[in-house]
Amino acid sequence: MLAVLSPAKRLAARPALDLPADLAPSEPRLQDQADALARVARDLTAADLRRLMHISEPLARLNVARFAEFHEARNAAVPAVALFDGDTYAGLEARTMDADALRWAQERICILSGLYGLLRPLDRIQPHRLEMGTRLATERGVTLYDFWGDRIAEALNTRAAETGARVLVNCASVEYFTAADRAALKLPVITPTFLEERNGERKIVSFWAKRARGAMARFIAENRLNDPADLRAFRAGGYAYEPDLSTDERPVFLRAG
């Protein structure tokens, strides 16, 4: 079983992660493609970044500086799960994983990225902001989806072949999972859905759903899951499997609001 997560927009101010002696940070397998994108992004102005990603002027200026220094600042790279600091990563809580779970996660948890394509948790990455939905023109087209094409799906196929995984658990957002070309992907996909019931209405509450996606990835890693049926035992955040709302491809987990 593989699981995929979205990255986080919010980055840790002081990223830190204690690793066991036999587990070292790794390098992104699609670093060459990240370098190519960084060269394109380096030519963008703060106004360009504000328009493309709808971000503030200070954040746009910060990322102009990051892309300008991208190829000279590789020593600033840190493991992805230490750098990402959003709600999903609060649910994942990689800093509190034991060594065995972290080793398993390094092999089986994948992080989708607009800049790096596909990451392992301990892949060293640099601070950046480049959302997958960005309409950044490259030699491959006018969006990052065009740039990545089937490369992310093929990278997932490679991970599956290396690990023997036979199913992919999609804990990513629609924006990011769209980058995994389903026609090229050789794995069946299971997409857990996290709903909150309040006043008789069931709906996705973004904050809790993002945390639950990270917690689901942690649950998979801690329990070394391979059988999709075992996902039903997930209980973090007050969620519980709801069989009447679920299908094999879309297990639904419900919590009271």
Swiss-Prot record:
InterPro entries: YaaA (IPR005583). One of its GO terms (biological process) is response to hydroperoxide. Pfam families: H2O2_YaaD. It comes from the Bacteria. One of its GO terms (cellular component) is cytosol. Belongs to the UPF0246 family. NCBIfam families: PRK02101.1-3. This is UPF0246 protein RSKD131_2757. It comes from Cereibacter sphaeroides (strain KD131 / KCTC 12085). The lineage of its organism: Bacteria, Pseudomonadati, Pseudomonadota, Alphaproteobacteria, Rhodobacterales.
